[in-house]
From Swiss-Prot:
Record's protein name: Adenylate cyclase type 8
Lineage: Eukaryota, Metazoa, Chordata, Craniata, Vertebrata
The organism of origin for this protein: Mus musculus (Mouse)
Annotated gene: Adcy8
Activity modulation notes: At rest, the N- and C-terminal domains interact, as part of a larger autoinhibitory complex, with calmodulin pre-associated at the N-terminal domain. Upon a calcium rise, calmodulin becomes calcium-saturated and subsequently binds to the C-terminal domain. Fully calcium-saturated calmodulin then leaves the N-terminal domain, binding solely to the C-terminal domain, and the whole autoinhibitory complex dissociates, resulting in activation of adenylate cyclase.
One term under GO cellular component: basolateral plasma membrane
Region ranges (Involved in AKAP5 and PRKAR2A interaction): 1-107
């Protein structure tokens, strides 16, 4: 760092920094453990499902730090942003500087809209970096001007958006209403005090006109207070402004009355000062209005003083002194009003940013929920949470490869396969093929919902679903048959529209299933059982265009459908081997009128179309796009779904249209305003009188927060000192030299304070001075010392001059006339100016916005005590002489008593103003703390979403959905010319699997399968297999692909990924052997590998699924199904590539491959034996840590949910609380009504023995 660059780092900046959350077990590779991925997501699902309580309105790498306290500007010191940092919510715009070194706008317009977020490495999907919050220049019309860090007022301190300005005015409406009431009450109490004193002390009765005016003005102020209080729910900002104008008019009229001799406070200069201070600091007037009002009041008083002089000792210097006095109060008032309003606007923006962060957090919650539900049905998540929520043993969440399986009886399983799809895929482009599949399966999903079926999975062109899961249904077989009939009608309509020979082959069987999720990667909900295998074989042994059912399904149909013999044994070896009787549903004689409603609409209009395309969705219905409801738009607030709108606090938007962006934020702010009106945060976190936080740690962080307007406050205090000097110079002491020395010293001392606090903005100053400046600005105690020193200097400037009054040469007390008094300009002739300048010193306390209000009160009391001591004892004669000279006998209250009353009024006004500012600043601080917590949670949620998205899509595909402009509404599809495809099955697992009491109806068999798949998944975590993507598991078959990354398609080593796939196949055989040793089994893998061109894409909107299609996929599958257990079979084309890469093969011969040999004849195949020589580029195996089964993930999140619940119960009435204390844990997590799980015969949560 250069010596000229001094960065002031606040000790409290960590409060505004998104703290890193070190991933457990991270080895530096950038991988994050998966066991906490579902924590907030499932909590959100649970809360959405069961919690309807009232919601309050109220990471890795080095983060960019920024402190921006209430009333502060963005000219803070920010350290350099590292390359791996995450932008905080409160940050400078890209075009803003940490320090302004010249006369510039406080909020300069940003030069660009780019983000400063660093790169997240090669695996970053691009949505972990928080969106940079808009800078203040995006909100303000004119944020003021600054020079060397000192902010100067502007008259147009308002927001650009009218809606935002309206919300801001409403946000602080209650505070301003209260300030006006307090000001009027204070004025009324002053009048009543004077009235009581007059009745008690005055020797003569009160002038009737004076009494009438007193009662009239008191009545006006009482009526104003009553109207403002009574109409508080209906009071608008404009109405409040007009009431403020009426209050000012009433006070100014009293000044006029005092000038005419009908006031209770002498000539009324002190009351003018109070009126000016109240106009700027307590009345709800815009700054422009306040300036006009202040100038009008000042001009009125000066005019009256000149035209109707009421003092015996009078001079032009005294008039000039008044002018300077009023100028000083107006200048201080402008600074106070502007900086106070600016502080409130900053607090409002922080509230808005907090609301925006909360809205983004809810959006992330909704994305998380959709991601979870795209993998797992809601009933499974809720049942798992319900069963695991009482598990308190911490070590259970770390147990190895847990599974969670449900068993359901009395269900029907439907398998459907598109006949002719392979030939169709060769005639369509990648985009057309994926679009067709998406539209076709979207219709099937819609039909499944109508017929009460649950879609399980899509396997290429195969679709299968289950009825009776999760809700039990007596007509589950009927639902599947109706589903099959609708599918056949749909595919026939497709065939008629596309002119392609496609049809459906459907098989249905009834029985029981086990359902759940296996493995560590690419989670997909699936079903397993003997009955699932039968349904699959019924499909493969069926007839295109017909529904092939078993005897079990026929028995469930109760004769409601006409059937005929299916002869499935003749077409399928499995059916023949197990002697399964089959039947075919007779196709009903129906026309297109019985098609699904949306297709009927299309068929009616299709005859009118002259140019029909290849798709079949030209009607009124169109399928949703995959992930359209999950990722939303990049860098914008995702629109809330109508279902998710109910999640907003207090169901804010139940009756509203779905909105997004600023409109939704503004709606939420309105709700926040309603909550804020109850002062919940103040009662819960802030002590009533001192306004200190009840939490000592919060108080410490708040006290260490940088005060960005401290320099401006100090400059304003220095200006006040200059005005005090000017006033007392116009009315000099008889001892001119001591006074000159006094003010010279005070000005130099104050100049030194200003210099030492602004030195950081002057690079020409010594480095040690600038570092001292940084330390002062960042240290609470040092700032307070400077503040007290400034107040003391101003106070000494106001009071010390009284020491130079010479009683020996004082003016004569008798026989003075107005004409002869013009020569007397000694300040001792006007002792009340000692009080007026003392009032200016008191106003100096109000200038320092961040000074604690209790400390202000203490300082003000000390000032009044010193003045009382001087006026009542040492210099009482000076005031008595002045009263004898200028006041008539009717004046019951002397100058010194009136002065103390005036100071008491200022004490109450300044203290209340300080309390309001401090409350605003502390409330702003609480909002920031809350926003920071929610942003950290949002960051963690986004990390969870990224990892979950990785479990659904390859990284480059995930980036497509997150970075691409989603307005184009294009499906994701990609053609690849050189990829490797592998299928690895366990042929012996079907014989091993059995549903008996001994193995818990097949659960123990699936437990072992889970261990096998999990071991396979862990192999993919090794660096050498980073080019391989798991696609899915199909029963006991494992499917993986290499070369899908666009980089691999363009690299020089075109088939390096294929070699990695072959190495992976060899590693799988070693892994299964290791499993056999520990499980006492003798499983063997049967693996098939092929390479070539494929089409990849994402289909399905509700359950998006990434898949690949093409001849290469079919050939790899046939290499597996026609292979030999314990061997790896490849076709000749793959053999020719791998043999040159150091692999050894054994020639098998020519085999018949269904679906391919019909056109190309028999296929030459080879068995992969291994590597002849090791690959020198293969690094030693290195496992990435932190992979756990789905059950371990959910178990961990449940225990975390319980811990969070305890924390939230502590804040049950807090704005940020979303869980009420009265709910019972069991009630919260137990499904209500006829929920799923009633049909589950047993669930498994135990571990592998």
């Amino acid at each position: 760092m250069e010596l000229s660059d001094v960065h002031c780092l606040s000790g409290s900046e960590e409060l505004y920094t998104i703290q890193p959350t070190p991933p457990a077990g991270d080895d530096g590779s950038g991988s994050r453990p998966q066991r906490l991925l579902w924590q907030t997501a499932v909590r959100h699902i649970t809360e959405q499902r069961f919690i309807h309580g009232h919601r309050g309105g109220g990471g890795g790498g080095v983060s960019r730090k920024a402190s921006n306290p209430a009333g502060s500007g963005p000219n803070h010191h920010a350290p350099q942003l590292s390359s791996d940092s995450v932008l905080p919510l409160y940050s400078l715009g890209p075009g803003e500087r940490a320090h302004n070194t010249g006369g510039t706008k406080v909020f300069p317009e940003r030069s660009g809209s780019g983000s400063a977020s660093g790169s997240g490495g090669g695996g970053d999907l691009g949505f972990l970096h928080l969106d940079c919050a808009p800078s203040n220049s995006d909100f303000f019309l004119n944020g003021g001007y600054s020079y060397r860090g000192v902010i100067f007022p502007t008259l147009r301190n308002s927001f650009k958006s009218r809606d935002l300005e309206r919300l801001y005015q409403r946000y602080f409406l209650g505070q301003r209403r209260k300030s006006e009431v307090v000001m009027n009450v204070l004025d009324v109490l002053t009048k009543l005090t004077l009235l009581v004193l007059h009745l008690s002390l005055a020797s003569a009765p009160m002038d009737p006109l004076k009494g009438i005016l007193l009662g009239f003005f008191t009545g006006i102020e009482v009526v104003i207070c009553a109207l403002v209080v009574v109409r508080k729910d209906n009071t608008s900002h404009t109405y409040l402004q007009y009431s403020g104008v009426v209050t000012w008019v009433a006070m100014t009229t009293q000044i006029l009355a005092a000038g005419l001799g009908y006031g209770l406070l002498g000539d009324g200069i002190g009351y003018v000062l109070f009126t000016l201070f109240a106009t700027y600091s307590m009345l709800p007037l815009p700054l422009t209005w306040a300036i006009l009002a202040g100038l009008g009041t000042s001009l009125l008083q000066v005019t009256l003083q000149v035209l109707i002089p009421r003092l015996a000792v009078f001079s032009i210097n005294q008039v000039l002194a008044q002018v300077v006095l009023f100028m000083c109060m107006n200048t201080a008032g402008i600074f106070i009003s502007y900086l106070s309003d600016r502080a409130q606007r900053q607090a409002f923006l922080e509230t808005r940013r907090c609301v925006e962060a909360r809205l983004r957090l809810e959006t992330e919650n909704q994305r998380q929920e959709r991601l979870v539900l795209s993998v797992l049905p809601r009933f499974v998540v809720l049942e798992m949470i319900n069963d695991m929520t009482n598990v308190e043993d911490e070590h259970l969440q770390h147990q190895f490869h847990r599974i969670y399986i449900h068993r359901y009886e009395n269900v029907s399983i439907l398998f459907a396969d598109v006949k002719g799809f392979t030939n169709l895929s060769t005639t369509l482009s990648a985009q057309e093929l994926v679009r067709m599949l998406n539209e076709l399966f979207a219709r099937f999903d819609r039909l499944a919902h109508e017929h009460h079926c649950l879609r399980i999975k899509i396997l290429g062109d195969c679709y299968y679903c289950v009825s009776g899961l999760p809700e039990p249904r007596r007509d589950h077989a009927h639902c599947c048959v109706e589903m099959g009939l609708s599918m056949i009608k749909t595919i026939r309509f497709v065939r008629s529209r596309t002119k392609h020979d496609v049809d459906m082959r459907i098989g249905i069987h009834s029985g029981s299933v086990l359902c759940g999720v296996l493995g560590l990667r690419k989670w997909q909900f699936d079903v397993w059982s003997w009955d699932v295998d039968i349904a699959n074989k019924l499909e493969s042994g069926g007839i295109p265009g017909r529904i092939h059912i078993s005897k079990a399904t026929l028995d469930c149909l109760n004769g409601d459908y006409n059937v005929e013999e299916g002869h499935g044994k003749e077409r399928n070896e499995f059916l023949r081997k197990h002697n399964i009787e089959t039947y075919l549903i007779k196709q009903p004689e129906e026309s297109l009128l019985c098609l699904p409603e949306d297709i009927v609409k299309e068929s009616v209009s299709c005859s009118d179309r002259r140019n029909s395309g290849a798709t079949f969705t030209e009607g009124s219905w169109s399928p949703e796009l995959p992930f359209d409801n999950i990722v939303g738009k990049q860098n914008t607030l995702a629109a809330l779904t109508r279902n998710s709108i109910n999640l907003l606090p207090n169901h804010l938007a139940q009756a509203l249209h779905v909105q997004s962006g600023p409109e939704e934020i503004n709606k939420r702010i309105e709700h926040t305003i309603d909550l804020r009106s109850g002062d919940k945060l103040r009662r819960e976190h802030i002590k009533p009188f001192s306004l200190m936080f009840k939490d000592s740690s919060l108080e410490h962080k708040y006290s260490q927060m940088r005060d960005e307007v401290f320099k401006s406050n100090l400059v304003c205090a220095f200006i006040v000192l200059l005005f005090i000097t000017a006033i007392q110079s116009l009315l000099p002491s008889s001892r001119l030299m001591p006074m000159t020395i006094q003010f010279s010293i005070l000005i130099m001392l104050h100049s030194a304070l200003v210099l030492i606090t602004t030195a950081e903005d002057y690079k020409c100053l010594p480095l040690i001075l600038r570092k001292t400046c940084c330390w002062i600005n960042e240290t609470y105690l040092a700032r307070n010392v400077i503040i007290f020193a400034s107040i003391l200097i101003n106070f000494l400037g106001a009071v010390l001059n009284i020491l130079w009054c010479d009683f020996d040469k004082s003016i004569p007390l008798k026989n003075l006339t107005f004409n002869s008094s013009a020569v007397f300009t000694d300040i001792c002739s006007y002792p009340e100016y000692f009080v007026f300048t003392g009032v200016l010193a008191m106003v100096t306390c109000a200038v320092f916005l961040r000074l604690n209000s209790v400390l202000k009160l203490a300082v003000l009391l000390i000032m009044i005590a010193i003045y009382a001591l001087l006026t009542e004892t040492i210099y009482a004669g000076l005031f008595l002489s002045y009263d004898n000279l200028n006041h008539s006998g009717e004046d019951f209250l002397g100058t010194k008593e009136a002065s103390l009353l005036l100071m008491a009024m200022f004490l109450l006004a300044v203290f209340y103003h300080g309390q309001q500012l401090e409350y605003t600043a502390r409330l702003d601080f609480l909002w920031r703390v809350q926003a920071k917590e929610e942003i950290n949670e949002m960051k963690e949620l986004r990390e969870h979403n990224e990892n979950m998205l990785r479990n659904i899509l390859p990284s480059h595909v995930a980036r497509h959905f997150l970075e691409k402009d989603r307005d184009n509404e294009e499906l994701y599809s990609q053609s690849y010319d050189a990829v490797g495809v592998m299928f690895a099955s366990i042929p012996g697992f079907a014989d091993f699997y059995s549903q008996t009491e001994m193995n818990n109806q097949g659960v123990e068999c699936l437990r072992l399968l889970n261990e096998i798949i999990a071991d396979f998944d862990e192999l993919l975590g090794e660096d050498r297999f980073q080019d391989i993507e798991k696609i899915k598991t199909i029963g006991s078959t494992y499917m993986a692909v290499s070369g899908l990354s666009p980089e691999k398609q363009q690299c020089e080593d075109k088939w390096g990924h294929l070699c990695a796939l072959a190495d992976f196949s060899l590693a799988l055989t070693e892994s299964i052997q290791e499993i056999n040793k520990h499980s006492f089994n003798n499983f063997e893998l049967r693996i098939g590998i092929s390479h070539g061109s494929v089409v990849a894409g994402v289909i399905g909107a509700k359950k998006p699924q990434y898949d690949i299609w093409g001849k290469t996929v079919n050939l790899a599958s046939r290499m597996d199904s026609t292979g030999v257990s314990g061997r790896i079979q490849v076709p000749e084309e793959t053999y020719l590539i791998l043999k040159d890469q150091g692999f050894a093969f054994d020639y098998r011969g020519e085999i018949y491959v269904k679906g391919i040999s019909e056109q190309e004849g028999k296929i030459k195949t080879y068995f992969l034996l291994g590597r002849v020589q090791p690959n020198p580029f293969i690094l030693p195996p290195r496992r990435l840590p932190g992979q756990y089964s789905l059950a371990a993930v959910v178990l961990g999140l449940v225990q975390s949910l319980n811990r969070q619940r305890q924390k939230q119960l502590l804040n049950e009435n807090s704005n940020s609380g979303i869980i009420k204390s009265h709910y019972n844990r069991r009630t919260l997590l137990t499904p209500s009504g006829p929920e799923p799980g009633a049909q589950a015969e047993g669930t498994d949560k135990s571990d592998l023995p």
